[in-house]
Amino acid sequence: MKDMDSVSAMMSQIGQRAKEAAASLGFASVERKHAALISAAEHIWTQRAAILEANAKDIAYGRDKGLSDAMMDRLLLDEERLRGIVTSLRSVAEQADPVGEVIAAWDQPTGLHIERVRTPLGVIGVIYESRPNVTVDAGALCLKAGNAVILRGGSESFHSSKALHACLVQGLRDANLPEAAIQLVPTRDRAAVSEMLTMTDTIDVIVPRGGKGLVGLVQREARVPVFAHLEGIVHIYIDAAADAEKTLKVVMNAKTRRTGICGAAECLLIHKDVMPTLGADVIKELMRAGVEVRGDETLSAIQGVVKATADDWGREYLDMIVAARVVDDIDDAMAHIRTHGSNHTDCILTEDARAARRFMTELDSAIVMHNASTQFADGGEFGMGAEIGIATGKMHARGPVGAAQLTSFKYLVSGDGTTRA
């Protein structure tokens, strides 16, 4: 009980500090926010040896816990990935500042001039699992949008997140911004998550970033509004009019480039007319690359294909595994996606413009692609600098959540002694 009380008191203090920081951060100048992000990027690069040392502790911890290869890949930092984090941070710094942007403006016959302008959300709570880079992405995007943020990373990335967070705080300090603008929960105790979900007085929105278990827990127990980032059950439909060269290139990239990210392809749907030719070539190429293919009855006749079970449809592997089945036509493909998908990202490979238009119009996923790798389902690749997650719900934000999506708006109404009749 005493431990629970101490966690509750700690989270209450963190929440109060965040609320106070948010009050001043909402009016912080563009120049100060830019300076804080650029400075943080410089500190990360300067302190990369210490950050990699901290990450080595997390890797050892993850190995002892028996984490899967996919989870270990998400956890791993090296110099190249740190360079990517620094580049992303600088990119966010250079983005247009969304705060104060006039979204719409109009005049009423009554003489009123009305503007709808972007405003910060306030305090954002981000709960995530093993990826240490989320510490930087979430901190940077929230700061850019004038929000304070409370970060609760996974126990596996505890040391890495701490080291990266210290660089973000140094950036805030250098720019004379409140250090409480970006806070990291300093404990692995899971009670901190439960506390965050009920902090309605200090947290304005919660963003869960992780697997089905984490997101489900947050959606069930949160009393604070939630931006849901569901698992990426990503489908690629190979149409009868697909180009062979493009298809092979896109499928291989979508599945094998990085299997542990939410935009990795998890299920292939192959039109029956191209199954004996292009479909078979794709399956064999995947297996040659070391991918385990779990196929339906038709595909399991190909040597090396494992027969799929009911559990393989609608599953996020995050590994060198893909489910695959033959479909009768585009309607059959879309029906499968509606049944087993997660409204994250889905793709059609075709040269038939009409089929592409139907697929992109009729499917209701947050991101729908045509002839492009699903690994592009990423805020950085969308020109947002970074993302805090891919929102799969329909309220407020959808798709990659960048700085602009971390704002609300208010109406500024001006008159000249104007009264209502």
Curated annotation (Swiss-Prot):
**What pathway is this protein a component of?**
Amino-acid biosynthesis; L-proline biosynthesis; L-glutamate 5-semialdehyde from L-glutamate: step 2/2
Q: Which UniProt keywords apply?
A: Amino-acid biosynthesis, Cytoplasm, NADP, Oxidoreductase, Proline biosynthesis
Molecular function via GO: glutamate-5-semialdehyde dehydrogenase activity; NADP binding
The reaction(s) this protein catalyses = L-glutamate 5-semialdehyde + phosphate + NADP(+) = L-glutamyl 5-phosphate + NADPH + H(+)
Q: Name one GO biological process term.
A: L-proline biosynthetic process
**What is the documented function of this protein?**
Catalyzes the NADPH-dependent reduction of L-glutamate 5-phosphate into L-glutamate 5-semialdehyde and phosphate. The product spontaneously undergoes cyclization to form 1-pyrroline-5-carboxylate.
What is the name of the protein in this document?
Gamma-glutamyl phosphate reductase
Organism (species): Roseobacter denitrificans (strain ATCC 33942 / OCh 114) (Erythrobacter sp. (strain OCh 114))
Name of encoding gene: proA
